[in-house]
Amino acid sequence: MVSILQLQTRTEASPASSASAAATRIFAVRRQQQEQEGEEEEEEFEFQERMDLSGAQGELPIPMHASAAASPFAGMGAHGGAGGGHVVELHRHEHVGNNGQAMAMASPPPTNVAVAAEQEGSPVAGKKRGGMAVVGGGGGVAVKYRECLKNHAAAIGGNATDGCGEFMPSGEEGSLEALKCSACGCHRNFHRKEADDLDADSCAAALRAAAGRHHHLLGPALPHHHHKNGGGLLVAGGDPYGAAYAAARALPPPPPPPPHGHHHHHQIIMPLNMIHTSESDEMDVSGGGGGVGRGGGSSSSSKKRFRTKFTAEQKARMLEFAERVGWRLQKLDDAMVHHFCQEIGVKRRVLKVWMHNNKHNLAKKPLPSSPPPPPQIPPMSMPPSPPPPQIPPMSMPPSPPPMPMPMPPSPPQLKLE
């Protein structure tokens, strides 16, 4: 009876052990393939770093092999057989279902591994590795390399380009020759990199197409989940560029700025004539006390000087004290100065500054002693001057009468017969 039970147990355990052994062999082969691919990627990346002489116009895109078998545990996810790296949920949700449905599968079906290997060898994967036309499958950024910017006259301090207008690879995509331009012979990094963002419609269409292509990699049907915050965004496709682009588009837009003139902070600005300034500049914020007020100053600047305001009584008392001590504080009068400052509520340093600022304006200047006025000399009386002698007018003799002029004799007249 015991032998029959042992035989039956071995018979029942044999299919499970054979399945686990097959899964182990599949994982071992897959790990070996991934190690070989990782070594090839490291060699290609090192070569690209050695060839990168310019360091300008962007960075070299590193080939990213993101497929269904990106992890040795491909197919073992929290969603029950979903291909690793193919479905990205961009929201938080709570799963409501049986624990058996949420558990991971014990081993992936061999068909998924075969399909993943076939997907890696497809032209789509080759396009991802090339990094020439499209970076990131399933919608992303189209990258083009335009004119060559290499300066061939840099050694002599000049600037000269070869005139190459567009990068043309020398070999097939994914090879080392593809990084060299067949037209000018320069590395691809010397050419200007141009990235064109695709619009939202084309990105959504590409995402849907990629989801349709990779639908057969998802395994069994996923259990239905209930979400508290509504439906999320599922990004299909095996590259991080498409996922990052979709994640950026799934984020909520920033709140619009408030309309102009509403919900803004009001700042009170006092006119200058409303601020009572005094003649003293206080260098310390804590200067003054009692009846000493503060000038209008901003609290944002800790180094701003505040002007101390004095009352009329304080000014009169300080003026009287300054005149009494001669507008100068001496060490011999420290006790008297301290007592006076306590009486009027002003610090000693503030009093000293006030006296220094107002010494030339408020100090009573003694008037210079004027000499006695000179004695007034009475004016001397002068005798009156005699009148000028009157000269009689001279009589002119009468003019003689004019003498008649004798007429000359007329010539004799001749008579004609």
Swiss-Prot record:
**For this UniProt entry, what's an example GO CC term?**
nucleus
| Compartment annotation | Nucleus
Keywords per UniProt: DNA-binding, Homeobox, Metal-binding, Nucleus, Transcription, Transcription regulation, Zinc, Zinc-finger
ZnF ZF-HD dimerization-type span = 145-194
Residue stretches spanning the membrane: none
Q: Which domain of life is it from?
A: Eukaryota
Q: Gly residues: which segments have biased composition?
A: 286-298
* Compositionally biased region (Polar residues): 1-12
Q: Mind listing where the DNA-binding region sits, in residue ranges?
A: 303-366
- Extract the InterPro entries matched here: Homeodomain-like_sf, Homeodomain_ZF_HD, ZF_HD_homeobox_Cys/His_dimer
Composition bias, Pro residues? 368-417
Q: Where is the composition biased (Acidic residues)?
A: 36-46
A GO molecular-function descriptor: DNA-binding transcription factor activity
According to UniProt, residues marked as the site described as Required for DNA-binding are M355
Q: Does the keyword Chaperone apply?
A: no
The protein's matches in Gene3D superfamilies, at most eight in alphabetical order, are given as:
Homeodomain-like
Please note every region of biased composition (Low complexity). 13-22
Ranges for region Disordered: 1-22, 31-50, 281-309, 361-417
What are the GO BP annotations of this UniProt entry?
regulation of DNA-templated transcription
What does this gene product do?
Putative transcription factor.
Quaternary structure, per UniProt, is: Homo- and heterodimer with other ZFHD proteins.
Q: What is known of its domains?
A: The homeodomain differs form the typical one by having namely 4 instead of 3 extra amino acids inserted in the loop between helix 1 and helix 2.
Protein name as annotated: Zinc-finger homeodomain protein 4
- Organism field: Oryza sativa subsp. japonica (Rice)
Q: Which gene encodes it?
A: ZHD4
